[in-house]
């Protein structure tokens, strides 16, 4: 074999072995595992926990990768490739899933990267794939990426795509739980702080006019060729839920739907639907990135941002970007505005026609209107190089008189000429003509004219008539300005006082002023300013001579006179002042006399004196007799004394000091200081040493103490307050008796507090100050008067603490009640300026509710034990709570309770942003089971639900109502609505309503309730609306005894409440009953109450007939009541039918008009019946006096057999009844004894004797 053949054979064998090795490593499961094992071993920082499966079902778990500045942790990566597709020249990925991925990148720790080389332009990008690529499913679950201070989290993402040639299709995609936390701009700016530079205009810098001229000399939209996108993209459906971006602003998108496609430059937006916390957006449209770039976009939005909450926006964009573009905007809601605009972006000069129209614009947008503009019309037409502007509107407001505003102007890129701005108001006109030019510097020239202004109608207490003119001109350039007022003139009168203002002045930004003369005169009062504040010389005089300020302005009074002079030079100025005022008053403030006198010079040192004396300062709750301030000396040695005499504060202080100009340092001493305050006198125990160093911007305050009879506050060591420093404050004693002047009479507090505060700060470093505050109470007792009864609360231990260290704030407390339980806990906030994570715990141990028993009446009490072990979590925006709160052995006995409560319990379990409620309310008869849950995972959209179920719970409202209820109700609560639904069964009830007093009268429907200020009370409405939908079922054993009616009730009512109010729907029936009226015993034959709306307006359908046993001739006579409760209609009826007079006779007498009985006997029987009917309560009270219960006087029988019957209970189960005939002397004695609740033994003795056994049925 030749050498060439050997070499060729060796190369061939090597290639075959290499290809076989690659095929083994890549194409087999074993080889693939070997590749990952090698990577796990040889790749620095890589660690793979587990590898299973092959290319068809490959799973990598517990992957870690770490490099400087980069840390990656992956829980699981799954890849499934369809190898069969390779035979069809396509690539198919059946599944690509990433789960529990955490990536942390710190760019500061990463090695610097090499500068990127500039890539040469290679023409338009064209993306195309030679083989079809299909990704059936890509899924991301629990992905967290942090890059420096930016965090991106994805809860769940699923999608898929198909790519063939240039066509890329994104399959239906779902994204849930996206959070992008951006750093706040202030934090970034603080890290990248740069010393500001003041840039002065450069000689070659273009003026604003030239810049605008160059801008509009060419089209705003440059010449553009057709745009060819590298891909044809089709997004079939992209749905997002709970997408949130935080930072300087917080944006939460609840739901989002996007459908869009782009084919050969033709873009089509089928659907864009966004529902966010700031509002909703719906958009659709088309656009073409070629030819003239036509567009057609429609957008509709509803805002949910104060004050534009509820504002609806409709935007329409049409036309073409390179031809005429038309934009229309309609706003409706709190602000109604219509805007129409046409422009040509591809034409030089930017042609623009803009029109804004609004019938009404008000501010604020919600609530009471303070400003309003009606019929607003604004129009701008032309080009930016030559345009006209006009505006018309009428305005009014709370403090603004009605006015009509007219504006006409012309302008170009160099200037705007305000032809006329007219404000027609107050019976006159205010006109402004001006020219503003920015071709070189920004300069202006204008004239303001007042003509015929009259305020008599708008301000009748301060009428004024004014005319005037002011001319002004000036310029602004490079941060400096200058202004010249060549003419200022104002004439007229104010409340019969002549007004005269005239003068001229000029000045600049260097505070150099030349004032030839300014004169102000109002009636006899005048003020003059004249002089110059020049570059070197200072010579300015100001004088005031106001002998009659009374009513010159509303609420102003008194007199004032004085002069102020400025002399010297800029390097050595001198200020002299001498001002005197007497009888000054402004609104409710009055000063009897004031004097200011001073002479201050500044040469190499500032020296002089200043004396201020103010006598009798008075206003509500303030009465100061005298205030004096004396300051004198020089920089090297000066002193100040302040004296105050009066109420509520009086006292004095003395301050001495010296200033070193070279060192820019002031040293002083505060001494002889004491004040009298409403909480007692305060005085310094030692002088305070003060030291201010201006170069360091730091002040030192020496140790001292403030002493009060009930308190002592001390600074034990020197405080250096500057950019950095530390302060320690000790509260050695604080008696709560000091608070008595500020507490209501119903509250009393006693005890001693002591504490300490230690705070340090350093503004040159990032983060918050450091500090700790502790407060401890001894013998603390608070007594609150509730319902004229004292409620004392004594504290055995009362400790409070607050700590701020290492970017963590902590608040702790320990409260032990005397002879009671304990309440303690701590709340921690980590990173208060950033994430504000919460931590800590709250504990309650054996808190006994018996502590409130003193406020209960005799025989009433409360019992129960409250315990809680709670733990805080989450952050301030989304707080979390864990643990349990339990109220056990709860028992409240009181007349206000509708049932007799037995020991009950209530338990609440908290698990993060959710909680559950379980409880049992036990009563003497029956119990109520409570269950519920709450969720505050969305703090602005929390919800709570409580269900109550019970069986025959006895409810008692003495002395009228006893009933059994079986509730099955559900109460739901959200921030916007309370809802009560369910059913309440009343199987048994006894309702007894006593007669109203004869003097009782109903409340008039037009009554108006007044408050303490004699103003009508505003009806209180619930801040959150309440909707109810309850069904009340009245069972077969419900009886009522009210106003002579004894009856049984049945029926069903539906109780509904909404924003319209409370309403009842349903029917109450009266199956049987009796009604005592007019001395007669009427039987309810038919009774129906129909409810359909307000509860006080039922429809009545009632028939009550006379007892047939007491009516002759088998006649049925009665009363029929129909109509509404407020307008009932009553009529008498009979069976058989007969005239009304005959029916009335049978109703009242029990017999007809043609009866053989004498009229006197009939009249006697009727009158006795009527009299007995009116004396029932009087007889009952007499019986109670003699120990006979339920003593009653009644009539029985008809005609000659009528009797007067007296009955009563002499023993709890023994009833005695005695009857005497009205027209004969026959008497009947009846004894009835109750053997069992419904079994009676009755003995009757009269003309006949009888012994009966009676049993009572109810059906």
From Swiss-Prot:
Swiss-Prot/TrEMBL keywords: Cell inner membrane, Cell membrane, Membrane, Signal-anchor, Transmembrane, Transmembrane helix, Virulence
Record topology, Periplasmic segments: 28-1259
GO-annotated cellular components: plasma membrane; TAM protein secretion complex
Localization annotation: Cell inner membrane
Keyword Cell inner membrane: yes
One biological process term in Gene Ontology: protein secretion
Membrane topology, as annotated: Single-pass membrane protein
Principal subcellular localisation of the protein: membrane
Family note: Belongs to the TamB family.
SUBUNIT field: Interacts with TamA to form the translocation and assembly module (TAM).
Function: Component of the translocation and assembly module (TAM), which facilitates the insertion and assembly of specific beta-barrel proteins into the outer membrane.
Protein name: Translocation and assembly module subunit TamB
Species, as recorded: Salmonella typhimurium (strain SL1344)
